[in-house]
Amino acid sequence: HVRMKRHCENARMISKYLLQNSKISKVYWPGFENHENHLIAKKQMRDYGAMISFVTKNNDFKKAIQIIERLKIFTLAESLGGVESLAGHPASMTHASIPKKVREESGVVDSLIRLSVGIEDVDDLIDDLDQAIH
């Protein structure tokens, strides 16, 4: 329980940071009341989890790759369940074999980045994202 509490607290803080970042156009996290599955998550979960996805402004594939490459604490991975913070770029990883049109229709746009937020110090994680995004 202690571990999940830390995951969720970190995800909440990172989601709020991303939401206020001028270089980010969309943030997906079920703790936001405007998230399409917020009520389901509220009913089924004790908290809102540690999975976050976000889209950069202008939906730039190359910019998303640059962000991933600049991350120092978040590790590039397709796995999503450890105590460490992980980042992935679905358009070039898990969904790379899906035709772009089909992929984008399902919401996996070119600049979508998926995070599995770990239990590291949240200020360090936010600083890492900030330096990678800017």
For each of these PLM feature ranges, what is it?
Residues E9-R12, K16, Q20-K23, D124-H134:
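Well-ordered, non-transmembrane segments within structured domains
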Residues H7, N21, H35, H89, ...:
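Histidine-centered active-site/metal-ligand motif
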Residues V2, R12-K72, L76-G81, P99-E104:
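Conserved small-domain helix->loop->beta segment predominantly found in fold-type I
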Residues R3, N58, S85-H134:
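PLP-dependent enzyme catalytic core of the Aspartate aminotransferase-like
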Residues N10-A11, L71, A91, I119:
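Generic short alpha-helical hydrophobic face used as a protein-protein interaction/packing hotspot
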